[in-house]
């Protein structure tokens, strides 16, 4: 795992088309903004896991 340190307003690049920007830090929460092409799905981990579980349930019918 690559670990990076960024300050508010700083951005990191993932490939050529995805940017992740630190928007703010309040206590133990970090607000980030993600810019990605429409064909790239961006989800919080818990949402992604729920989507995968739903897909798995649908394929088992």
Curated annotation (Swiss-Prot):
Disulfide bonds: none annotated. Residues 2-7 are annotated as: Region 1, important for regulation and mRNA-binding. The keyword Ribonucleoprotein does not apply. Changing residue 47 to A: 90% loss of in vivo repression and activation, 67-fold decreased affinity for RNA, about 150% wild-type protein levels. InterPro entries: CsrA (IPR003751), CsrA_sf (IPR036107). Its main location: cytoplasm. It is found in: Cytoplasm. Changing residue 35 to A: Increased repression and activation in vivo, about 75% wild-type protein levels. Gene3D superfamilies: Translational regulator CsrA (2.60.40.4380). Induction: Activated by MqsR. Activated by DksA and (p)ppGpp, under partial control of RpoS, the sigma stress factor (at protein level). Binds to 4 sites in its own mRNA and represses translation. Expressed from 5 promoters; P2 and P5 depend on housekeeping sigma factor 70 (rpoD) while P1 and P3 2 depend on RpoS; indirect activation of P3 leads to increased transcription during the log to stationary phase shift. Disruption phenotype: Essential, it cannot be deleted when cells grow on LB but cells will grow with pyruvate as the sole carbon source; if glycogen synthesis is impaired then cells become viable. Most deletion experiments use an allele which has a kanamycin-resistance cassette inserted after amino acid 50, which retains about 10% residual activity. Increased levels of glgC transcripts during both exponential and stationary phases. Decreased levels of enzymes involved in glycolysis. Increased biofilm formation. Decreased expression of it antagonistic small RNAs CsrB and CsrC. Residues 40-47 are annotated as: Region 2, important for regulation and mRNA-binding. GO terms for cellular component: cytosol. GO terms for molecular function: mRNA 5'-UTR binding. GO terms for biological process: mRNA catabolic process; mRNA stabilization; negative regulation of translation; negative regulation of translational initiation; positive regulation of translational initiation; regulation of carbohydrate metabolic process. Signal peptide: none annotated. Two regions important for regulation and RNA-binding are found in the N-terminus (residues 2-7) and middle (residues 40-47). Both are part of the intercalated beta-strands that form the hydrophobic core of the protein; region 1 from one monomer contacts region 2 of the other. The homodimer has 2 distinct RNA-binding regions on opposite, solvent-exposed surface of the protein. Homodimer; the beta-strands of each monomer intercalate to form a hydrophobic core while the alpha-helices form wings that extend away from the core. This is Carbon storage regulator. It comes from Escherichia coli (strain K12).
């Amino acid at each position: 795992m690559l670990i990076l340190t960024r300050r508010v307003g700083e951005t990191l690049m993932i490939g050529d088309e995805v940017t992740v920007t630190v928007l703010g830090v309040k206590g133990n929460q970090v607000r980030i903004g993600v810019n990605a092409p429409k064909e790239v799905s961006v989800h919080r981990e818990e949402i992604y896991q729920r989507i995968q579980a739903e897909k798995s349930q649908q394929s088992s019918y």
